[in-house]
Regions:
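A bilobed periplasmic-binding-protein/Venus flytrap-type ligand-binding module shared by bacterial periplasmic
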Residues: 147-152, 190, 260-272, 282-283, ...
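Short, low-complexity disordered leader/linker segments with a strong preference
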Residues: 1-41, 346
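A ligand-binding cleft/hinge motif common to bilobed small-molecule-binding domains
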Residues: 104-108, 228-247
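Extracytoplasmic ligand-binding site segments that recognize negatively charged/polar headgroups
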Residues: 43-55, 73, 77-78, 93-227
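Periplasmic-binding protein-like
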Residues: 142, 172-180, 203-204, 211-212, 246-268, 282-306, ...
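Conserved N-terminal structural module of periplasmic/extracytoplasmic solute-binding proteins
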Residues: 26-97
Length: 346
């Protein structure tokens, strides 16, 4: 398969996600095929957090597309992928638009000729990863980082990089999300295994790392002090620190953050291609990307600033850990099994 722009590694994995909070209304056009003029039903499968969908995305997308009924199926990336896999086998794909975290999954869908190529009118403004033919665009960029509780540790005491998590002084006090359930955690495992070898995870296992179902459990246990440090998504920590004034702090590892440019794509089986294209255009618009940043993720556009409390997107991109997306796409089951055997088996 021909590698898309982001596979070249030069593509700037900027910013962020669709898990967006405040999905403000889109511009209405006279053209019935754009923004407010589209009609019919549209089904979106996504890994965006439920509270963001219910409290912000639904009402604001409804405002952007008043004549189109937008339905949402939400779940972790792996839950959504499992659902889609069954629908593909049954030749009954119910989703029109897909917005899940793991970029490598879109490579598999493209190989299976299941995506609808669409050159968005916002194409020139997207400086993050995208397929050359428009079959997918990064719509949100998440960053896997290390976090700690500022009330429990001083900055100079906290881990500085990924290898520090294997230091015996953190034994039994570290955690990470489950790559069997989380697309972003899966990417992190693949990236770190490539950079440091699977022996890295042997060391984490020996150091008593705990694998939690999701980020919520991790952040709560960081707050209580059960965990001293943990691998977690940046947006979770930024949200708590800025909206609830919690003492959680972000560490941008000196050996590189793990950028996850999560895409948006249209299935070529959609019965509402005009509505799906309008949805893609809106998410990639400046308004849509500003909403992404309100969800504490980074934008895929160069004219939208990073979320409050974060580091300039360009700096994170320049120092990121290299990810072999094609390898992740081709070896999903093997990578997960290797992790399970080395870390999760007793």
């Amino acid at each position: 398969m021909k590698k898309s722009k982001w596979m070249l590694g030069a593509a700037a994995m900027l910013a962020l996600s669709v898990a967006l909070a405040g999905c403000g209304g889109g511009d209405k056009k006279d053209d019935g095929k754009a923004a407010g003029g589209v009609k019919g039903d549209l089904m979106v499968y996504t890994s965006i957090y439920p509270d963001i969908i219910d409290n912000m995305c639904k009402p604001n997308v409804g405002k952007a597309f008043p004549d189109m009924k937008v339905n949402w199926f939400q779940g972790g990336t792996e839950k959504v992928v499992t659902k889609i896999t069954g629908e593909i086998k049954a030749k009954k794909i119910a989703a029109d638009v897909l917005m899940v975290a793991d970029p490598s999954y879109y490579l598999k869908l493209k190989e299976q000729n299941l995506l609808l190529p669409y050159k968005s009118k916002e194409d020139a403004n997207v400086i993050s990863d995208k397929a050359a033919d428009g079959s997918w665009y990064a719509v949100r960029v998440c960053n896997m980082i290390i976090a700690y509780n500022g009330n429990k540790l001083k900055p100079e005491e906290a881990p500085k990089n990924w290898t520090d998590l294997a230091d015996p002084k953190w034994k039994g006090k570290i955690a990470m999300p489950n790559p069997m359930l989380s697309g972003t955690a899966y990417v992190a495992v693949g990236a770190l295994a490539d950079k440091y070898g699977w022996e890295y995870f042997d060391k984490l296992k020996a150091n008593g790392i705990r694998v939690e179902e999701g980020n919520s459990a991790i952040q709560n246990k960081l707050l209580t002090g059960e965990y001293a440090a943990a691998m977690i998504l940046e947006e979770n920590i930024l949200k708590l620190a800025n909206t609830k004034k919690e003492p959680l702090k972000v560490i941008y590892p000196t050996d590189g953050v793990i950028n996850i440019p999560s895409p948006i794509a249209i299935f070529n089986t959609t019965k509402n291609p005009d509505g799906a294209k309008a949805m893609v255009d809106w998410w990639l618009s400046k308004e849509g990307q500003e909403a992404v940043v309100k969800g504490w993720m980074h934008s895929v556009r160069g004219d939208v600033k990073e979320p409050i409390g974060s580091v300039e997107t360009k700096k994170l991109v320049e120092g990121r850990i290299k990810v072999d997306w094609q390898k992740l796409a081709d070896n999903n089951a093997q990578i997960k099994e290797e992790f399970r055997k080395r870390v999760m088996d007793k």
